[in-house]
């Protein structure tokens, strides 16, 4: 899935996160900022990377500002931000 424009999903509220997606040529860059990075940083990275892989995202810039979100919320916000950033023609709904 190709990211063609910038998009946002989520909020800065407690137990949520804000995901920012932007196009970038050549590589995938994921930046994660979290209040619970020491305790759950590995799990947050894993969920974000698995979600991006399932969507077929191979390049772009993904910035995650986490406020203690659960895994299901992380997946939903990443999916929403990526889908908003695509042209809508190449969505593979069965992967969601």
From Swiss-Prot:
Q: Which UniProt keywords apply?
A: Cytoplasm, Phosphoprotein
Q: Which residues carry this modification: O-(phosphoribosyl dephospho-coenzyme A)serine?
A: 14
What Pfam families does the entry give?
ACP (PF06857)
Q: Does the keyword Ubl conjugation apply?
A: no
Q: Where is this chain primarily localised?
A: cytoplasm
A single Gene Ontology CC term: cytoplasm
Q: Where in the cell is it found?
A: Cytoplasm
Q: How does it assemble?
A: Oligomer with a subunit composition of (alpha,beta,gamma)6.
Family assignment from sequence similarity: Belongs to the CitD family.
Classification via HAMAP family: CitD
Q: What does this protein do?
A: Covalent carrier of the coenzyme of citrate lyase.
Q: What is this protein called?
A: Citrate lyase acyl carrier protein
């Amino acid at each position: 899935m190709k990211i063609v424009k910038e998009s946002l999903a989520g909020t800065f509220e407690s137990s949520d996160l804000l995901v920012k997606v932007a196009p970038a040529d050549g590589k995938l860059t994921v930046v994660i900022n979290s209040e619970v990075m020491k305790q759950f940083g590995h799990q947050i990275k894993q969920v974000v990377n698995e979600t991006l892989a399932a969507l077929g995202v191979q390049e772009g810039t993904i910035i995650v500002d986490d406020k203690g979100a659960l895994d299901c919320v992380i997946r939903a916000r990443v999916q929403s931000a990526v889908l908003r950033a695509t042209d809508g023609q190449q969505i593979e709904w069965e992967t969601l």
